[in-house]
């Protein structure tokens, strides 16, 4: 973090991208500014954004590989230049781009002699490779070589205890961190009592998303962290009240949605987009992946449809209903149903 004195003027708080470039397929760079900020605010925003960018952004990577016959990870396979461990390390470096949630299967099945690169990975439709030229192995003889892979979207470091996997399956200590580095610097501007600060933020990513996309996702995650405090203040509830709150059975959600559909006359549901419902980024992304874009799309789904969405949880179901009840001018209290 760097501080410098520069000349500047006070304006309404705003941000913009002042530099953006692609150094390689796996290295994107972006530089952003936010100004004007009061003294101390730039540090607050800079520290929070840096931590969110490095620790809260989700990435997709290969987490497991299964070989046909390999007694241990340090063994070699006839006709292959690399050892099993070297192949695992190469797979760890593969950069993937996707919006999937949960575990997906992929595979490699080729015949030598030839070089194996990331382009040879057979992926599910929702996943794409950022750099198809990334090396995996070199087959030196005319052998059939097949690997079963597992792909997962997560955040941070994924570590798993090493074991003697009898079936030839080995975990890969993947790093789901699309943001490679973040720097911020603070510049002071103005004179006398009118001093303000300008925050400069530099972001490097691995190509699976742009720095601008990473900044947007990190900001959404930070907002989601503070939403519970805002909701608690609006509802006027205490922690003791929340602790003793009763959680009813699943079927109440479906009853309430059914009732809402019956009372939707006069509301242009196809003109109300889920972007307007103040959903958390997690719930919002789940619905978007299921092609649910408007309130009409949402109300056309049954509870079973929603629960089949990848990574959709009971907490998301409750959050959706609470949001609908908050924003729609429909009195459902007469049903005496509550979450």
Swiss-Prot record:
GO terms for molecular function: DNA binding; DNA-directed RNA polymerase activity; protein dimerization activity. SMART domains: RPOLD. It is found in: Plastid, Chloroplast. It comes from the Eukaryota. It holds the Pfam family RNA_pol_A_bac. SUPFAM superfamilies: C-terminal domain of RNA polymerase alpha subunit, Insert subdomain of RNA polymerase alpha subunit, RBP11-like subunits of RNA polymerase. Its main location: plastid. It catalyses: RNA(n) + a ribonucleoside 5'-triphosphate = RNA(n+1) + diphosphate. Keywords: Chloroplast, DNA-directed RNA polymerase, Nucleotidyltransferase, Plastid, Transcription, Transferase. Residues 264-339 are annotated as: Alpha C-terminal domain (alpha-CTD). Its EC number is 2.7.7.6. One of its GO terms (biological process) is DNA-templated transcription. Residues 1-233 are annotated as: Alpha N-terminal domain (alpha-NTD). In plastids the minimal PEP RNA polymerase catalytic core is composed of four subunits: alpha, beta, beta', and beta''. When a (nuclear-encoded) sigma factor is associated with the core the holoenzyme is formed, which can initiate transcription. DNA-dependent RNA polymerase catalyzes the transcription of DNA into RNA using the four ribonucleoside triphosphates as substrates. This is DNA-directed RNA polymerase subunit alpha. The lineage of its organism: Eukaryota, Viridiplantae, Streptophyta, Embryophyta, Tracheophyta.
